[in-house]
């Protein structure tokens, strides 16, 4: 008896780290193109930092008593040199590290933006993944409320550009360090009076990071959090003036907002302004963008004291909203699919495809799937499935006569007839196709 072949195990991706397939990539490209145009309009420059950083960057920058550092980071020890490394869970600390390391602020403030994958070890659910993507901005060296207002208004302009509705702005002020210290004393006193009612997470944070107790999602603690001393009541004149200045600028630009005294954010580097853009269309994961001011962070990471603010938004959540509101654009096909029959025709077709690409047209040349010549019928089926506007047909007869067939697969051909096929001299092919596409586009606009 012959030995049966051992079945090879099929490998799959890591849970919570998703592939972006071709049918979805068009939506990603649409979003990326839209947001990049917006960032250029505000004078922001792209910065790209490594995915892996020293763990200390995040423990010092984000804060050791935070969910991200305590529970969510992908950290490991480099076997070669014993360095403690972490796959970035967010990118603000890394951008600040790069700005300090490369002395980027020596000649004045910088407006920077980034886009890329982040990593957090948490339970995957709708809109929340272990590998997720963010786009963010960092305005380094700007101290006034006008910078806060500008980065908030950038988000509003992006929602408008994408056609998104129902995303609401919540703002708060975390004040200055001495104001947070005074509030912390009173907050701990208040929470101690309710210690028996606190859950384990709140008890753990009571003396290490009590401000985060106010941000609890536990329904049983909502009343306690709601009645807790509010940080906004501890603000001094400078913090109040900054917060009021922000509100005036938002109102002057018709940006509606709600002041949420319990909005504290999950990272320790924030001060003064914090904000979130939230929606009720994504279930529990309602925050689509968030940010604020982090003036202490640059000094905290070894730079000179420098004011800064920024935001980050989760791309997957924005794309979910685009799908939810049927705003995803149709995926465009190529301009031309080149079909051929016979060896001489294949060679001429290959050359013609390259010449068409020289003019800026998007062209698919039919390649054999199994090495054997494909029938004309199967090639035309592939051409139609590709989404191409036109099929360009090279047959033996056409090659002998110095001509080529052109068939409109979408809309009308050069003579205005739907799905018409015409014979065109090879030397006139490019001009014919360009004119036919212009005519087809005009028909589509009518």
Swiss-Prot record:
One Gene Ontology CC term in the entry: cytoplasm
Keyword Cell inner membrane: no
Keywords attached to this entry: Aminoacyl-tRNA synthetase, ATP-binding, Cytoplasm, Ligase, Nucleotide-binding, Protein biosynthesis
EC code(s) of this entry: 6.1.1.21
Catalytic activity: tRNA(His) + L-histidine + ATP = L-histidyl-tRNA(His) + AMP + diphosphate + H(+)
Matching PROSITE patterns: AA_TRNA_LIGASE_II
InterPro entries in the record: aa-tRNA-synth_II (IPR006195), aa-tRNA-synth_II/BPL/LPL (IPR045864), Anticodon-bd (IPR004154), Anticodon-bd_dom_sf (IPR036621), His-tRNA-ligase (IPR015807), HisRS-like_core (IPR041715), HisRS/HisZ (IPR004516), HisRS_anticodon (IPR033656)
Any one GO molecular-function label of the UniProt entry: ATP binding
Disulfide topology: none
Localization annotation: Cytoplasm
One record GO biological process: histidyl-tRNA aminoacylation
Family named by the database record: Belongs to the class-II aminoacyl-tRNA synthetase family.
Subunit details: Homodimer.
The protein's name in its UniProt record: Histidine--tRNA ligase
């Amino acid at each position: 008896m012959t030995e049966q072949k051992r079945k090879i195990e099929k490998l799959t991706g890591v849970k919570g780290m998703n592939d972006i397939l071709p049918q979805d990539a068009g939506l990603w490209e649409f979003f990326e193109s839209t947001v990049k145009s917006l960032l250029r309009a505000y004078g922001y420059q792209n910065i790209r930092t490594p995915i892996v950083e020293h763990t200390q960057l995040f423990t010092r920058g984000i804060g050791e008593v935070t969910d991200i550092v305590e529970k969510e980071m992908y950290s490991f020890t480099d076997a070669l040199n014993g360095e403690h490394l972490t796959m970035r869970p967010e990118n603000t600390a890394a951008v600040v590290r790069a700005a300090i390391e490369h002395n980027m602020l020596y000649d004045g403030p910088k407006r920077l933006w980034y886009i890329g994958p982040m990593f957090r070890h948490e339970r995957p659910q709708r809109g929340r993944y272990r590998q997720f993507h963010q786009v963010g901005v960092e305005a380094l060296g700007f101290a006034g409320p006008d910078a806060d207002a500008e980065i908030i208004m950038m988000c509003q302009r992006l929602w408008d550009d994408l056609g998104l509705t129902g995303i609401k702005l919540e703002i708060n002020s975390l004040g200055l360090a001495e104001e947070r210290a005074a509030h912390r004393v009173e907050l701990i006193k208040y929470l101690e009076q309710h210690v028996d009612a606190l859950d384990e997470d709140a008890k753990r944070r009571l003396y290490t990071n009590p401000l985060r107790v106010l941000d609890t999602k536990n329904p049983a603690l909502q009343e306690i959090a709601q009645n807790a001393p509010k940080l906004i009541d501890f603000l001094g004149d400078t913090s109040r003036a900054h917060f009021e200045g922000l509100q005036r600028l938002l109102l002057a630009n018709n940006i509606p907002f709600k002041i949420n005294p319990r909005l504290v954010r999950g990272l320790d580097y924030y001060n003064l302004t914090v904000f979130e853009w939230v929606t009720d269309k994504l279930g529990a994961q309602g925050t689509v963008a968030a940010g604020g001011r982090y003036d202490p962070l640059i000094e905290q990471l070894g730079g000179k004291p420098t004011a800064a603010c920024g935001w980050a938004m989760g791309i997957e959540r924005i794309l979910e909203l685009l799908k939810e509101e049927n705003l995803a654009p149709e995926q465009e096909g190529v301009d031309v699919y080149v079909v051929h029959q016979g060896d001489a025709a294949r060679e001429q077709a290959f050359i013609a495809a390259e010449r068409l690409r020289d003019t800026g047209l998007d062209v698919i040349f039919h390649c054999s799937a199994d090495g054997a010549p494909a029938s004309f019928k199967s090639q035309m089926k592939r051409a139609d499935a590709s989404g191409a506007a036109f099929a360009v047909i090279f047959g033996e007869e056409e090659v002998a006569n110095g001509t080529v067939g052109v068939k409109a697969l979408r809309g009308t051909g050069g003579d205005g007839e739907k799905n018409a096929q015409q014979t065109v001299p090879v030397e006139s092919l490019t001009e014919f196709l360009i004119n036919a596409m212009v005519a087809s586009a005009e028909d589509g606009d009518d």
